[in-house]
Amino acid sequence: MEHQLQCCEVETIRRAYLDANLLNDRVLQTMLKAEETCSPSVSYFKCVQKEILPYMRKIVATWMLEVCEEQKCEEEVFPLAMNYLDRFLSFEPLKKSRLQLLGATCMFVASKMKETIPLTAEKLCIYTDNSIRPDELLQMELLLVNKLKWNLAAMTPHDFIEHFLTKMPLAEDTKQIIRKHAQTFVALCATDVKFISNPPSMIAAGSVVAAVQGLHLGNTNTFLSYQCLTHFLSQVIKCDPDCLRACQEQIESLLESSLRQAQQHNVSSETKTVEDEADLSCTPTDVRDVNI
């Protein structure tokens, strides 16, 4: 019988156990006080930016999310990168031709903060179809960190999600499901300019409520009912329950519109494919080569 090597490697990242000392109430209260210090200006499109418009932010944010997903970055990288981008735009006018450069630079710095193996400048330049050079990205990195005054450890909604789940009397597998759905909502919120005005703790709490509602977990667990969970989380982050409900409803509305846009995009793509196939079958190849 021939000897065979058995590969036992797995792609699961080994993580340290959660430190209970970092999840106590004292730490949470400190985080709630600190989150305001790293918040961007709500009105920077009107007061600071001359060329950058909200829809441009949406385009570059969607591109950044796709890059982070394709590179399998940590969940915290994208929201942190968007925090850098919004804070930079809050007090530094930028030409629209340099917005993608700023987005790539924000991912570059955020991955250094959250990844064990950060994204390289060369790789990010490839994702821009080489429209920027590595030396341009490194120069923008210096400008970014100086404008942010090297205050790079900003609070994101991800920092609060684990605190909320720790306080909830649920089985670990249920927490894991809620965690994954809430993280998806957080990423979605980071792409939409309407959520700039909401503090990270509010977005995190709204995402958890939206995740529980979407999974219909309140049907089997009284604690997870809409009223109980909203009241509980509003007390944890010390906010008005109505404000939390409004944020959660805004998140669900954003999800619906995103799904609707995705479906329309799929339909238009299928229609385009059918039209291309019909065009190919009806038009002789030699006709395409005629230079009119």
From Swiss-Prot:
Family: Belongs to the cyclin family. Cyclin D subfamily.
Location of Phosphothreonine modifications: 283
Keywords: Cell cycle, Cell division, Cyclin, Cytoplasm, Nucleus, Phosphoprotein, Transcription, Transcription regulation, Ubl conjugation
Compartment list: Nucleus; Cytoplasm
Species classification: Eukaryota, Metazoa, Chordata, Craniata, Vertebrata
Name of the featured protein: G1/S-specific cyclin-D1
GO process annotations (BP): cell division; DNA damage response; G1/S transition of mitotic cell cycle; mitotic G1 DNA damage checkpoint signaling; negative regulation of transcription by RNA polymerase II; positive regulation of G1/S transition of mitotic cell cycle; positive regulation of G2/M transition of mitotic cell cycle; response to UV-A
Gene name, Swiss-Prot/TrEMBL: CCND1
Database matches in SUPFAM superfamilies: Cyclin-like
GO molecular function: cyclin-dependent protein serine/threonine kinase regulator activity; protein serine/threonine kinase activator activity; transcription corepressor activity
GO CC list: cyclin-dependent protein kinase holoenzyme complex; cytoplasm; microtubule organizing center; nucleus; transcription repressor complex
Post-translational modification: Phosphorylation at Thr-283 by MAP kinases is required for ubiquitination and degradation by the DCX(AMBRA1) complex.
Protein function: Regulatory component of the cyclin D1-CDK4 (DC) complex that phosphorylates and inhibits members of the retinoblastoma (RB) protein family including RB1 and regulates the cell-cycle during G(1)/S transition. Phosphorylation of RB1 allows dissociation of the transcription factor E2F from the RB/E2F complex and the subsequent transcription of E2F target genes which are responsible for the progression through the G(1) phase. Hypophosphorylates RB1 in early G(1) phase. Cyclin D-CDK4 complexes are major integrators of various mitogenenic and antimitogenic signals.
Membrane-crossing residue ranges in chain numbering: none
Database matches in InterPro entries: Cyclin (IPR039361), Cyclin-like_dom (IPR013763), Cyclin-like_sf (IPR036915), Cyclin_C-dom (IPR004367), Cyclin_N (IPR006671), Cyclins_cyclin-box (IPR048258)
Any single Pfam family the record assigns to this protein: Cyclin_C
Source taxon at top rank: Eukaryota
Main location: nucleus
Self-association and partners: Interacts with the CDK4 and CDK6 protein kinases to form a serine/threonine kinase holoenzyme complex. The cyclin subunit imparts substrate specificity to the complex.
